[in-house]
């Protein structure tokens, strides 16, 4: 199965914005090449997780090998490497691009170029990939392929004279795409005689075989008898099996340069087979690893706590297992007076955080409380020490610190220009600095802002979508740290500080956020048998307060008329009981209350 000459190999991926039809196109390619029979076909075939199908997004990388008979009568092997399209998963995209020689740039013919598409196209151009523009959804009534072609030329600078119009849904244009992959994407370089180097572009955990590693061989070859060495972890393994994804796994005896395959070697943890790492052979090792490997850095942090303290060991096991298939997830144990034992977790972004939470609840049957997300702050202490703080509750007191710096991102928003004003208003509310505004076409505009990451990780994306009826898209990247006048806002429930509700806010916004927070908590925390004071404070200064009135039994219901002193005695007795309850009572805060901090609008 693997005796295909290198000249007849093609490795490519599909670049697209969310909802532009990438997974449907991948399905159609698999079907047209006969890789998957029509009977076995299900929508979004390469999206294996239920969660991916439900949300209609691609999270984990998949790969599939297709055999295709081209117009010249030769049989070609096409390796499709599927990529995620969301900003949180750009690291996964960068790895899969490194494993390819070409890419299909899929653009919705009714919507045009979106921010995410651009970010990934630039990554592809950096990797010198051959890009084939494909206009999808041409069967839609609102499709305007010519206008979109001009847009691609003016924004990206790609020649669209050979752009292919297709409809992945109806199958129009699919044969042309397959032929273009053969004709226009170069075959891999023939480095079979060099030392073996293979790039790991994905790995997942299989409970029976250990970690399954997906790789692309850049030079040399790997056979089943070889002993392999992973260059960054310096660990060596005997191979149990190697094979190709067609798209189900098929064992083979050997693979050579240019091919994409998988291996199983009883590897215990994904941390040992890091994505982006280089595989080489123990007896003929390569001198240096492949370039461009960067460890994924978490941008957003939050606390995860089980609602039932007995589930703490289960949560730890679940996170361990999840990390086996998610190289970007970082976590460490933490405790909180209000919540007990839990974990402080780091994520690539908000979508990544939601997905991890949902997978923990769904696949491991856990009931979780998630605290508000925060970013990493750089705090300079009076004694000159610099601390990196990812948990607002651990921010040092004002008298001990000199300055606080927060991460800033450069954000590009693409939108129809009717929504210009409302988007600029949103960015200003979120402390954004206006940098530039460019008209891409007569009716589409790019807004460029520099904005604190902390303002983006809450509900910026939701707000942007709702203000523009879903038409805007954005892309951002980190540009460094800047000093700001930030304060720690604590929330006191029944005079006890609730750590998970602590946030770091700009001094000018503190009153508004504090007031909004206690008002929201008043709605969400159920009444107890005693009065609960809710307060927002900066240090020892209370800046906003609300109270939840007590539930009270009508102790006077049996007193019909009669002496007032009897009634007073009963009321006094009730008040005394409430006071005792208040000093001993614990307030249960529902999960919605913690999420309220997350969704609390800054406007």
UniProtKB/Swiss-Prot annotation:
SMART domains: EFG_C. It is a peripheral membrane protein. This is Elongation factor 4. The lineage of its organism: Bacteria, Bacillati, Cyanobacteriota, Cyanophyceae, Synechococcales. Pfam families: EFG_C, GTP_EFTU, GTP_EFTU_D2, LepA_C. One of its GO terms (cellular component) is plasma membrane. One of its GO terms (molecular function) is GTPase activity. GTP binds at residues 19-24, 136-139. It is found in: Cell inner membrane. It comes from the Bacteria. It catalyses: GTP + H2O = GDP + phosphate + H(+). It comes from Prochlorococcus marinus (strain NATL1A). One of its GO terms (biological process) is translation.
């Amino acid at each position: 199965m693997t005796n295909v000459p290198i000249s007849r190999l093609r490795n490519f991926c599909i670049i697209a914005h969310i909802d532009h039809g990438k997974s449907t196109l991948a399905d159609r390619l698999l079907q047209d090449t006969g890789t998957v029979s029509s009977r076995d076909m299900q929508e979004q075939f390469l999206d294996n997780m239920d969660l991916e199908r439900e949300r209609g997004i691609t999270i984990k990388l998949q790969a599939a090998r297709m055999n295709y008979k081209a117009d010249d009568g030769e049989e070609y092997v096409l390796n499709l490497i599927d990529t995620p399209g969301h900003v949180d998963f750009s690291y996964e995209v960068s790895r899969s691009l490194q494993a390819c020689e070409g890419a299909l740039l899929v653009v919705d013919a009714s919507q045009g170029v979106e921010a995410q598409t651009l970010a990934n196209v630039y990554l592809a151009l950096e990797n010198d990939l051959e890009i084939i523009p494909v206009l999808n959804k041409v069967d839609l009534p609102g499709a305007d392929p010519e206008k979109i072609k001009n847009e691609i030329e003016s924004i990206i600078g790609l020649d669209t004279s050979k752009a292919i119009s297709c409809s992945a849904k109806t199958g129009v244009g699919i044969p042309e795409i397959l032929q273009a992959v053969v004709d226009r994407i170069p075959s891999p370089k023939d480095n079979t005689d060099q030392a073996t180097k293979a790039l790991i572009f994905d790995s997942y955990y299989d409970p029976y075989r250990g970690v399954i590693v997906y790789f692309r061989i850049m030079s040399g070859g790997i056979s089943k008898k070889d002993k392999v060495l992973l260059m960054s972890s310096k660990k060596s393994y005997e191979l149990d099996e190697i094979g190709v994804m067609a798209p189900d796994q098929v064992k083979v005896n050997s693979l050579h340069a240019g091919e994409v395959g998988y291996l199983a070697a009883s590897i215990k943890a994904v941390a040992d087979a890091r994505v982006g790492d280089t595989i080489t052979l123990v007896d003929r090792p390569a001198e240096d690893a492949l370039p461009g490997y960067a460890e994924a850095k978490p941008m957003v942090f939050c606390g995860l706590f089980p609602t039932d303290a007995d589930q703490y060991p289960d949560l730890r096991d679940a996170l361990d297992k999840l990390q086996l298939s998610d190289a970007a997830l970082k976590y460490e144990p933490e405790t909180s007076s209000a919540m007990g034992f839990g974990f402080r977790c780091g994520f690539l972004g908000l979508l990544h955080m939601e997905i991890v939470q949902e997978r923990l609840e769904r696949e491991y049957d856990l009931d979780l409380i998630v605290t508000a997300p925060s970013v990493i702050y750089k705090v300079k202490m009076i004694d000159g020490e610099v601390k990196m703080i990812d948990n607002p509750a651990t921010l040092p007191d004002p008298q001990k610190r000199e300055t606080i710096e927060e991460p800033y991102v450069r954000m590009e928003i693409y939108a129809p220009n009717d929504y210009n004003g409302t988007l600029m208003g949103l960015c200003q509310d979120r402390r954004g600095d206006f940098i530039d505004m460019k008209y891409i076409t007569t009716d589409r505009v790019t807004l460029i802002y520099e904005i604190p990451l902390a303002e983006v990780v809450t509900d910026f994306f939701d707000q942007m979508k709702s203000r523009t009826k879903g038409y805007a898209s954005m892309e951002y990247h980190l540009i460094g740290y800047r000093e700001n006048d930030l304060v720690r806002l604590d929330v006191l429930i029944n005079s006890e500080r609730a750590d998970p509700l602590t946030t770091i806010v700009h001094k000018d916004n503190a009153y508004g956020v504090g007031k909004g927070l206690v008002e929201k908590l008043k709605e969400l925390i159920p009444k107890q048998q005693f009065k609960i004071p809710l307060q927002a404070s900066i240090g020892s200064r209370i800046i906003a307060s609300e109270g939840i009135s007590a539930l009270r039994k009508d102790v006077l219901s049996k007193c019909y008329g009669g002496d007032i002193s009897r009634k007073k005695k009963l009321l006094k007795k009730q008040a005394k009981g409430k006071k005792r309850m208040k000093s001993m009572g614990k307030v249960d805060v529902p999960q919605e209350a913690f999420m309220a901090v997350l969704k609390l609008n800054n406007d």
